[in-house]
Amino acid sequence: MRDLCNTDKPLFAVLTKLTYSAYLNILWLVCSLPIVTIGASTTALFYVTLKMAEDRDDGLTRMFFKAFRENFKPATKLWLILLAVGSFLAADGFVLCRMWSENIFWTLLTATLIGAAVLYGIVLLYAFPLLARFENTTFGILKTAFLVGVRYLFCTLLMAAVYGIMGYVIVFVFTPAFLLGMGFCAMICSFLMLRILYLIGGDPDAVHEEHDHDKN
């Protein structure tokens, strides 16, 4: 029993991370309810989970809402752009799913749409984590997300699998898993992409720390 309660044990560390991810998932869900704030809440979520991946988390709630406030405007702008593009692709997909086999034109158009959807998915995976760790323009974030996603394709596929498996588990296997949901996915993806973030920018948190120092 003493071993189970030892905070240095791997089992305790795993259970702690799971508990944290469930709590962060609740914060993310609540802050995403207005829909328009999904970008800011997702950026805040990744800000915290990337800190967790570095074992530098200190006060989950405080860090979450700090990142939420600081990134609200750029994250909302980024989210609205991605939402508009995603809605356009979804609407086109709904139409083409009924017409793709009618002739070669619709088949080629459907193939083009699928390719665009894949590229969109790649950008979506990296956009908010990058915004959580780097200061950049909206176009810069989108461009970097695409380039990073294509260059580190294996990590991209793993991250996509994390979200896909979680979605499958929630829908078909164990619905209460939604309590972990986005929080768990963000935490796993943060561990997967942390090394990449260092490779593309040295210390990606330096900008945030400089701002904190200036404020003090």
Question: Model regions: which residues?
Answer:
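Helix-coil boundary and N-terminal low-complexity module in membrane systems
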Residues: 1-100, 104-109, 113, 120-216
